[in-house]
Each structure stands twice: as C-alpha cells, then as structure tokens.
Amino acid sequence: MLYAVRVRGIYATALVALALKKGYLLSDLSKTMLSRVEVPVSTRPPNITVKHGEESRDEIVIHAFPYEAGERFEADLLEEVGHAAVRRSLLGLRSVVDARAAEGCRAEGPGGVLIIVKGGECPQPGSMVRVTVVRSPPGSDVVEGRVGVELTGLTVRVMHPGSGVRISRHLTSEDAAKALKAVEASGIDLNQFSVHIRSGARLASEGDISDEIRRLAREAERLWREGPGGEPAVLSRGEYLSLVYLPSTAKHVMDGLRTSLYPTVNNHHSLKSWSSEAEGLLTDFAEEGVREGLWGGEAGDLIVRFISSRLVGRTAVVLHRRPDGETIRLGPFRVSSYRPSSGRGGEIVLERTFRSPGVYDGLGLERRPGDRGVTHVYMGDWLTIHEYYDKSGRLLGVYANINTPPEVGFQGLKYLDLLVDVVKRPGEEPETIDQGELEKACRSGLLTDRLCEEAARQAERASGLLQSRYP
C-alpha cells in the first residue's frame, strides 16, 4: 500500500527527499515547501505526519494511521540515518484493548501493560473491560484509557458510547462547515456516538468524510456490543506514535538528503536544532550565499568554528542527553580554549572548580572543595575526556564519556550519551563501566543496532587511549 506523508518543521525538506526515495506519496505540503521544490503532491489525507519535536528539535515525531504505516516509515528513516535513539508508545494511541480491571481504577492490558482507567466509575476489580487508549507517551510506562470504543480514520475519529462533535483547530471555518455537513449526512445518532473531525478532513470531500463516519460508527458499535473477551488483547492497534532522537551523525545524513533538493550548508540541521534563533539566522544567511553562488556548503563548517571561538572566555553548559529522553545540564563551565581544525573538527576545553564536596561518579573517589575538572570536547569525535585534579594539581582520575560527536551552539555543547564509559585512576588499568546499561538499551530497541556497535567500538578505543595517555 502507498502511504501519504505530511512533513513539517526543520527537517521537512530532508523528509520530503527521504519520502520520495522510499516510495511514499507526499500530502498537504506547506506553501514554503511547494515554493522550494517541484515534487508530485497527492490530494489524499495523510497517513503519516512527521515533524520535529515540541520539546526538542533534536527529535522527530512520527504520528501515523494505520499503525503499520508508522512502523514502516520509522524503519525507513532508521535505515537511512543509521544512528538514533527511539522511544515508542507501549500501546498505540487510540488502540482498542481488552483489559482486566484491578484496584484503584487500573487495569492490566495486553503484555501486562498497566492502564489507568480515566472518566466515569472505576470498573469492578477482576472484571474484563474494553477500553480505548487515550494517552501513551513514547518512552513512558504511563498508559491511560477510557471505557468505550474509539476508532480512527484519515478524516475523523468516532467514539461509542459518546455524544457530540469536536473539530480540529487546524481547520478553516469553510472546511469545518463542510465536515459538519458530512456528519449530518452520515445519519449517525450523536447521542450515541461522538465524532472528532481531524485536520485531514480538509483534503477530503463531504461524501468521503460521511462514508468514513458511517463505517467507523458501525465497527465501533459492533466492538462495543460484543463485549470484552476473557483475556487481555488488542482489538485495534490505533495510531502509531514514536520519538526519534537524531544525534549529529544522523543530522549529517539529513543534511545530505536536504542538499539533494535545495542548497544546504554543512551542519544545517545541527545548527537549526538549537532553541535560540542565532544559529538558525547564521545558517539562513550562509544558505543565501550558497544559492547565489558566493560560496559552497562548507560555509556551515565556518559557522561551527565561529561559534566555537566565540565561546572562549565565556560560561557554557553541556546538554548530556540520555537515550531515555532525560537531558542533564552539566556545568556551567568556563570555556578556556578552542583549537580549530579543518571541517567540523577541533577541540574545546572546559574548566570548572568544585566548591562543594561529593564523589566522582564512576571513579568512586572523594571530591573536595577546590578540586578542578578539565573537560576535553573533541568535535567530530565520540569521546569526551574529563580530567579531575586536586588543589595542588595532582591528577585524581580520568573519565572517558562515550557519546555521539558533539554539536556546538551559543549555549554550549550537546550530544547523545551512549551509556557506557571508561574510567582510569593513576597507576591502575582502565575500567569499562555501565556496560549493562548499554546492553539493556540495545536489547530494548532504544538505540539502533549501528549505534550500539559504534558505542562498543568506541569504549574499546577509549580504554586503549586512557592507557597510553594517562599511564
């Protein structure tokens, strides 16, 4: 089946290139995109919406119906970029499932997933209930459901039992009026069914919307009347939802895809992914020059070197992103030096003096006030080296963090932490730590296979590096 894709956000042009490469239809392109590239556009409502995340521009949101459309697009994206961290919903949004009720308005769903039952009275513990999943954030074990059957289509969602009509805020008044006529023409009883008009209704005829309402209402009524079965089960998979974190290496692949359709500087997506506007404005300016033939894509490398040099003498933070979605702000650090090299390379040195006591993670050593930390960040490399010294300048230990090649912005630096690390105390052998965390993330699919393999290689490399550099 050919699925139609709608793209939005900072990765939109690259995603158009990917969709064309992988054989998808394109639907509902923005005016900006239509002015930028000449591509065939389908008039169908989209099956898949792909955009950058609301909380992090380093992430891509994949929201799709049917469920398998999202699975396929995610697989195609990961095959292309290679390196990513992926968080998925435990159960598809608006999946219809049978669950066994437990105490406290909870129910055990398929696979032992715990569902919090919202709205109305709590079901009798031990009884079987048929619920629709209304909330299942990617990467979270919190799943919320509502008793009843809600089915998704491309233009509408229909709930039974339910009542009333809701309309997507993305529809114009004209499109909303068309959809309301379709609801009326469907002939369903709005005291028994609720209808939510989706944004995709804008691209459908009144007759198509009406037909989908009737079809979903019949199926929802059938599923509700037959009642729950004897064991937890999925009856309808609902909508696919996942968050794909793109580290710098994946963003470079996206740069290449974008270049195939539109003039693009190196590091385009890394620079655009920062929350401040400054990096994006520099990128836009550089790409004006590319379009006018004044310089090439390497102007993006110059931007990275410029930002890195501007950090010297200032304070900066390191955004230490973990695969599970947690971001730890390390610092603030004082940026003591920057040593540039060709392309995206170079070394940024960060320093800080500790004012409070504590323990150096991984090394198991006491940290005293007055101790000093020196961090070597190697642009384009997979290792970040932390050196720890006492007040007299004696080396206490070294910590090699395994992470994706860092990205630089005016705020500081960011990377995806790969969980495994290597530590070394003076006069001792290097020790690899947290290997189990990496293996768990790889088994669960949180990290892609290629990224897992790279993390293992880099941990081995770090061990040899620490042995030779810090005997």
Curated annotation (Swiss-Prot):
Molecular functions per Gene Ontology: mRNA 3'-UTR AU-rich region binding; RNA endonuclease activity, producing 5'-phosphomonoesters
Enzymatic class: hydrolase
Keyword annotations of the record: Endonuclease, Hydrolase, Nuclease, RNA-binding, rRNA processing
Pfam families documented for this protein: DUF402
The protein's Enzyme Commission number: 3.1.26.-
Biological-process GO terms, alphabetical: rRNA processing
Gene3D superfamilies: FomD-like (2.40.380.10)
Keyword RNA-binding annotated: yes
Record's function text: Probable RNase involved in rRNA stability through maturation and/or degradation of precursor rRNAs. Binds to RNA in loop regions with AU-rich sequences.
Classification via PANTHER family: PTHR39159, UPF0374 PROTEIN YGAC
HAMAP family the UniProt entry points to: RNA_binding_AU_1
UniProt record similarity statement: Belongs to the FAU-1 family.
Record-given protein name: Probable ribonuclease FAU-1
Source species: Aeropyrum pernix (strain ATCC 700893 / DSM 11879 / JCM 9820 / NBRC 100138 / K1)
